[in-house]
Amino acid sequence: MVCKVLIALCIFTAGLRVQGSPTVPLPVSLMTKSSAPVATWTTSAPHTARATTPVASATHNASVLRTTAASLTSQLPTDHREEAVTSPPLKRDVNSTDSSPAGFPSTSSDGHLAPTPEEHSLGSPEATVPATGSQSPMLLSSQAPTSATTSPATSLSESLSASVTSSHNSTVANIQPTEAPMAPASPTEEHSSSHTPTSHVTAEPVPKEKSPQDTEPGKVICESETTTPFLIMQEVENALSSGSIAAITVTVIAVVLLVFGGAAYLKIRHSSYGRLLDDHDYGSWGNYNNPLYDDS
């Protein structure tokens, strides 16, 4: 029993400390973290339809903000009474970063936040009302981070457009100098050709110099074609007909036969028995090479 009493006293003192702790305004980073995820409100106030607008709609006009602020301030007493009944369990420690209970946004930390730049520009006194349970600062704070997020997007788009235009201008500037000297070149040539006929004479050898250069690749191609024997045979077949090829083969065979026939005849004539066919006398020495010759 004593332990239970001590635990109850500890819980009671902790609750008193939480309730009596001063509400310190949170920095901008905590404001964005606590207000950005909130998309809709689930209170029973008559202006819930106005509060259910998404966070992304950050492009509101000044007139819309003034009317919403005036309507919210006119409904502050009723909202304060309704939330006064349900607000005690919603109070929490300033240093805690835990989310509020389900169905209720964290309004205790957003109540003493400084007004956004949009509120200062509007100059409406309703924007500086201390909302200790009211919902107008939540709406304004939910609009502030979205406007802050849209401003970098616009700056990025402007920087991209500026870079694209600068690159386009640089390319145009690079193209124009190349085209500029080409344009006056033709009038000068026409002027020189009209006044001095020698310019034509100097311009004529240019194609003459190019003509041998054009023929040189043709020669190289012909030489490469002559190196292959298959192409040579094709050229020979195309140049000679079948009759000319037959005549060439016959002449080659006849020449071969004549050469071999003459060699055989000379060999037989100069053999050991060839001297008998001769009619002249060989002298006293006789023909000792012939076995039929009888010297006796």
From Swiss-Prot:
It comes from Mus musculus. This is Prostate androgen-regulated mucin-like protein 1 homolog. It is found in: Cell membrane; Golgi apparatus membrane; Endosome membrane. Glycans are attached at N61, N95, N169. Residues 21-244 are extracellular. The modification Phosphoserine is found at S284. The chain crosses the membrane at residues 245-265. Residues 266-296 are cytoplasmic. May regulate TLP1 expression and telomerase activity, thus enabling certain prostatic cells to resist apoptosis. Residues 78-95, 206-217 have a biased composition (Basic and acidic residues). Disulfide bonds: none annotated. It holds the Pfam family PARM. InterPro entries: PARM1. Belongs to the PARM family. Residues 96-110, 168-177 have a biased composition (Polar residues). One of its GO terms (cellular component) is plasma membrane. Highly N-glycosylated and O-glycosylated. Residues 72-220 are annotated as: Disordered. Its main location: membrane. Keywords: Cell membrane, Endosome, Glycoprotein, Golgi apparatus, Membrane, Phosphoprotein, Signal, Transmembrane, Transmembrane helix.
